[in-house]
């Protein structure tokens, strides 16, 4: 009986571990030096949300960016003349949206 109870408890603890929210870095504006200008905090990506990192480059140089939790997030890179917008989404580990 104790063996079954131990297995049940182990299963519950493992399941709870998988249900924990994903912690992401949150910054409304990263400057060209990669420093957060709007007080870096964290956010919890729950309900299929992901950590997001958006970066803007001009003439190959990083200009500014955004970090946070988003419900709709797609990985893509868009190039327009000398500007490159890069959007990265992740959910594989906590704080995965650090540049």
From Swiss-Prot:
Known tissue expression: Predominantly expressed in the seminal vesicles. Expressed in prostate, and to a lesser extent in the cauda epididymis.
Signal peptide limits: 1-21
Predominant location category: secreted
InterPro entries xref list: LY6_UPA_recep-like (IPR016054)
Superkingdom of the source species: Eukaryota
Residues linked to a glycan: 31, 75
Domain UPAR/Ly6: start-end pairs: 22-99
Family: Belongs to the PATE family.
Cystine bridges: 24-51, 27-36, 43-69, 73-89, 90-96
Name used for this protein in its record: Prostate and testis expressed protein 14
Summary of subunit composition and partner proteins: Monomer.
Induction of its expression: By testosterone.
One Pfam family named in its UniProt record: UPAR_LY6
Post-translational note: Glycosylated.
This protein's record includes keyword Glycosyltransferase: no
Protein species of origin: Mus musculus
Keyword entries, A-Z: Disulfide bond, Glycoprotein, Secreted, Signal
Keyword Ribosomal protein belongs to the record: no
GO cellular component: extracellular space
Compartments (UniProt record): Secreted
